[in-house]
Design a protein with these regions (language model features):
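Bacterial N-terminal signal peptides that target proteins for export
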Residues: 2-15
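Short, intrinsically disordered low-complexity segments
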Residues: 7-10, 25, 342
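Bacterial N-terminal signal peptides
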Residues: 12-24
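Signal peptide processing junction and immediate N-terminal pro/mature segment
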Residues: 25-31
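A cross-kingdom marker for long, charged
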Residues: 31-104, 108-358
Length: 358
């Protein structure tokens, strides 16, 4: 992304000059990302932590360097942190305020909808092997929230995984980002018709159907759609096979549609973070984007798509449960868990002679 280019440049120059370049370039990710938003996130996290009792706080907070920070997943399993289920009438509003700060209004709505699907699964599964509970979603803090130091927040549970990492004055990152939906479409009960990821599915299918035969031959990969996202819950990922139709091979209208898909998937995040991601994609060159599809093209067909650029990967898979179960992830090759900004942060501290141990 845009921040990665600057990171590589800054490694080669003295700290004072590097800091000057950072301030002049005013990258949306690191500098504008925005201090006001960062301050709001710090305040919301602090208020939430202050609402916890000593025992809860001990479980909610880890050292920033703890291995647990990278231990992410999207399946129903036991987790570290404090769950929404155990919060009282004073604490729960603080957690809600925190999530509304870290997510866009649409993102918060989607998280609530994903949680509501746990009730649907509880109703339709017979002798299910997983515990289904809309309140088994956990908040975990790593480090001490501040503008100067490094810290992180994780919000995670079945089919939700959000990771925000703050690297001192260098900014914040917001991946891995995962949202899933099971069922993808609710077909019975009070929530009949709910499709949490409708736009993310429909926009991509519309792009697929707009392709000519010649374009489709490039965009649609042979074989069946994979049974899940290829990168799974890997802690670090690299680019997948360079396949699919390239941005320059699309018409202007199709190019716009591709960018709409990307922005829609980013838009669970606050507007400032969305703007940073889109700016980074454009800085790395939209001509380097590729869109690939596997599986059938009709609603109800098992299918998979991915969008890949030099610095990021989006994977979408809807094959499980008779193609009614979506997994959708956004990964950043350099920036997941703040790796790029943390390297820059530690280098800057070291060059300033402050002797950071990392």
């Amino acid at each position: 992304m845009l921040k990665n280019h600057v990171y590589r440049l800054l490694r080669a120059i003295p700290f004072v000059l590097a800091l000057a370049i950072v301030l002049v370039t005013r990258l949306p990710s690191a500098q504008e990302a925005p201090m006001e938003l960062t301050a709001e996130m710090i305040a919301a996290t602090g208020s939430f932590l202050d609402s916890l009792n000593a025992e809860q706080r001990a479980r909610a907070v880890f050292d920033f360097d703890a291995e647990e920070r990278l231990n992410w997943h999207f399946i129903p399993r036991s987790r570290q942190g404090v769950s929404l289920k155990e919060l009282d009438a004073v604490q729960l509003p603080q957690a809600t305020s925190l999530l509304r700060t870290f997510l866009s209004p649409m993102g918060y709505e989607k998280t609530e909808q994903v949680r509501s699907l746990e009730v649907v699964l509880l109703e339709i599964e017979v002798n299910g092997r997983f515990v289904r509970d809309p309140d088994l979603y956990y908040l975990t803090v790593f480090g001490a929230p501040s503008l100067e130091g490094e810290w992180a927040l994780r919000f995670e549970g079945h089919h939700l995984a959000f990771n925000w990492t703050f690297a001192g004055g260098m900014g914040l990152t917001s991946t891995p980002q995962f949202v899933g939906s099971n069922p993808a479409e609710v077909r019975s009960g009070a929530l009949t018709g709910l499709r949490v990821l409708a736009a993310e599915e429909d926009l991509a299918r519309a792009l697929l159907k707009s392709l000519s035969a010649e374009q489709s031959a490039v965009a649609i990969l042979p074989g069946e759609a994979p049974g899940d996202i290829i990168t799974g819950s890997n802690r670090e990922v690299t680019a997948l096979e360079d396949v699919g139709i390239a941005y320059p091979q699309l018409t202007a209208q199709q190019q716009t549609q591709l960018m709409r898909i990307i922005e829609q998937i980013a838009a669970v995040q606050p507007a400032e973070i969305v703007a940073e991601r889109m700016a980074g994609i454009r800085a790395e060159g939209v001509e380097n984007l590729k869109f690939a599809w596997m599986g059938g093209g009709e609603l109800g067909d098992p299918h998979y798509y991915r969008i890949q650029g030099p610095g990021f990967l989006i994977e979408y898979d809807n094959t499980q449960n008779d193609a009614n179960h979506i997994h959708l992830v956004w990964r950043d090759f350099e920036g997941d868990f703040g790796r790029d900004l943390l390297r820059l942060h530690y280098d800057a501290v070291a060059q300033a002679g402050q002797g950071h141990s990392h």
